[in-house]
A protein has these predicted regions:
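Cytochrome P450 core scaffold surrounding the K-helix E-X-X-R motif
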Residues: 41-48
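Glycine-rich beta-strand-centered segment in the early N-terminal region that forms part
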Residues: 21-38, 50-93
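NAD(P)H dinucleotide-binding glycine-rich loop of Rossmann-like/cofactor-binding domains
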Residues: 45, 79, 85-149
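Exposed loop/turn and edge beta-strand positions of beta-sandwich/beta-sheet ligand-binding modules
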Residues: 16, 28, 64, 103, ...
């Protein structure tokens, strides 16, 4: 499959479109044919070497979020079916024609939401959720004052 990789860190000029092996899902994983991905700050930091690839591959496939169509499901996956439209987040490897992720890392794309729009949702919304609910302890019925809602996270 084709993927955008970096073999050295730097600006956009280090991005290379190349052939890499197709990923193979494990029993609890899904294989998604990526229709769209998004570019966010973490991607640019990873490209520059300031946000290392946690999987430590010989080449880094960038991209933290995706939207696409389910192509294969692992043997123990019951929540998804081939053909489902999903969006999700992964620790890299989304700038590729296919991505493998744990079944819990994917969300269904609501009817009426285009794949291109869905690709820009996971990273920023999960970042906002983590900040407000996980880190900040926000619960139902409580309020939070957000002084600045800038960048992609501000859209959430």
């Amino acid at each position: 499959m084709r993927a955008v990789v970096v073999t050295e860190y730097g600006g956009p000029e280090v991005l290379t479109l190349t052939e890499v092996p197709d990923p193979v899902p494990g029993p609890d994983e899904i294989l998604v044919r990526v229709a769209h991905t998004a570019v966010n700050r973490a991607d640019t930091l990873q490209r520059a070497g300031g946000y290392p690839d946690p999987q430590r591959r010989e080449h880094e496939i960038l991209g933290l979020e995706f939207a696409g169509t389910m192509e294969t499901v692992g043997a123990r996956v019951t929540a998804w079916q081939v053909g489902d439209r999903v969006m999700g987040i992964e620790a890299g490897a989304c700038y590729a024609e296919r991505v493998v992720t744990h079944e819990r890392q994917a969300l269904p794309i609501p009817d009426g939401v285009e794949l291109a729009d869905a690709a820009a949702i996971p990273e920023v919304f999960l970042t906002a959720w983590d900040a407000l609910v996980v880190q900040g302890g926000l619960t139902s019925g409580r309020w939070a004052l957000v002084h600045a809602g800038a960048s992609g996270v501000g859209t959430a």
